[in-house]
Design a protein with these regions (language model features):
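Beta-strand-dense domains in secreted/periplasmic systems and polymorphic toxin scaffolds
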Residues: 189, 219-221
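Bacterial N-terminal signal peptides that target proteins for export
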Residues: 2-18
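Sec/Tat signal peptide C-region and signal peptidase I cleavage site
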Residues: 27-31
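Structured extracytoplasmic
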Residues: 32-174, 182-186, 195-202, 225-245
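Periplasmic/lumenal scaffold domains of single-pass inner-membrane subunits
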Residues: 177, 188-190
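Bacterial N-terminal signal peptides
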Residues: 17-26
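Short, low-complexity Ser/Thr-rich regulatory SLiMs
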Residues: 154, 179-181, 208-212
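Extended lipid/amphipathic-ligand handling interfaces
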Residues: 204-213, 238-240
Length: 245
C-alpha cells in the first residue's frame, strides 16, 4: 500500500519551477487564441491587402508631383511620369522643361550647384530608408509580430484599426498602419525613424486613396527631415491603365 508523501520546501520549489516552465511554454499559444489571435488576423489582412494592391498597381501609369521646401522656402515643383518596371521598381521619366540654371556669378552658381547635389544625395539616402516602410513589407511585418513588437489600437466606431510596429526596420523606429477593417484597405501610414543617428529624425505621413476599380494607392506623402529642415511633399495623380482601358 502506497503512503502519502508530504512535500517539503524543496518539493514546493520544484513544483513552482515546473509550473513556471509550463507557463512559459504555453503562454504564446494561449495568447494566439485571445488578443494575439486577433492581432495575427489583422497583420495577415494588411499583408494580403498590400500584396493585392501592389499587383494591381503594376497595370497603371501615373503622374508624380514633388514639392520640396528647404528651411521654409518652397522650391519649384517637379513632375515625373511613373510606372512599374519588369523588376518591380518604379520607373520615372521627368516631365516638363529642365530646371533653369542658377543665376549670378560663377562662384554663386558653383555654391548653389554643390548645395543641390548635397540635397539630392541626402534625399537618395532618405528614400532608400523609407522604401523599407512604404509599401509595408510582409516579411518585416511578420517578423515584428513574431518578436512581439506589434500592438493594436482599435476604433470600433470608425471601423479603422491602428496597427503599431516597433523596431520594424531598425531599433527605435515606429510604423503605424491605419487599416479600414470594413473596406480591407490601408488608409494611412505614419513612420517615425532616423538616418544614421537617432538625432537625425525623419518622419513620413502617407495618405491612401482608391481608384474606380477599388485599387488602393498612395495619394500623398509628406516627408520631414528635421535635421536638414527639409520637407518633401509628393502627390500621385492621373492614374491611367497601361492597357488603355
Amino acid at each position: 500500500m502506497k503512503k502519502n508523501v508530504k512535500q517539503g520546501p524543496a518539493g514546493n520549489r520544484s513544483m513552482l519551477l515546473i509550473g513556471a516552465a509550463m507557463l512559459a511554454t504555453f503562454a504564446p499559444a494561449l495568447a494566439q487564441t485571445g488578443a494575439g489571435g486577433e492581432l495575427q488576423q489583422k497583420v495577415a489582412a494588411v499583408k494580403q491587402s498590400v500584396a493585392e494592391n501592389q499587383q494591381r498597381l503594376h497595370q497603371y501609369q501615373w503622374t508624380e508631383t514633388t514639392q520640396l521646401t528647404l528651411k521654409g522656402d518652397p522650391k519649384p515643383p517637379s513632375q515625373s511620369a511613373c510606372q512599374y518596371g519588369p523588376d518591380g521598381k518604379v520607373l520615372k521619366s521627368p516631365l516638363g522643361p529642365p530646371p533653369e540654371p542658377p543665376s549670378g556669378g560663377r562662384m554663386k552658381q558653383k555654391i548653389v550647384a554643390k548645395k543641390k547635389e548635397e540635397i539630392k544625395d541626402y534625399m537618395g539616402q532618405v528614400k532608400g530608408l523609407l522604401a523599407m516602410y512604404v509599401p509595408p513589407d510582409p516579411q518585416h511585418m511578420q517578423q515584428a509580430f513574431q518578436l512581439g513588437k506589434v500592438s493594436l489600437n482599435p476604433n470600433p466606431s470608425s471601423g479603422v484599426t491602428q496597427i503599431v510596429f516597433k523596431d520594424y526596420a531598425q531599433t527605435g523606429d515606429q510604423m503605424t498602419i491605419s487599416f479600414d477593417t470594413v473596406a480591407k484597405k490601408v488608409s494611412s501610414v505614419n513612420v517615425n525613424t532616423y538616418m544614421d543617428e537617432p538625432k537625425d529624425v525623419v518622419t513620413l505621413a502617407v495618405q491612401f486613396a482608391s481608384l474606380p476599380d477599388s485599387t488602393n494607392y498612395v495619394q500623398q506623402t509628406v516627408l520631414d527631415a528635421t535635421a536638414k529642415k527639409l520637407v518633401v511633399t509628393t502627390t500621385n495623380s492621373d492614374y491611367r491603365s497601361l492597357g488603355g482601358q
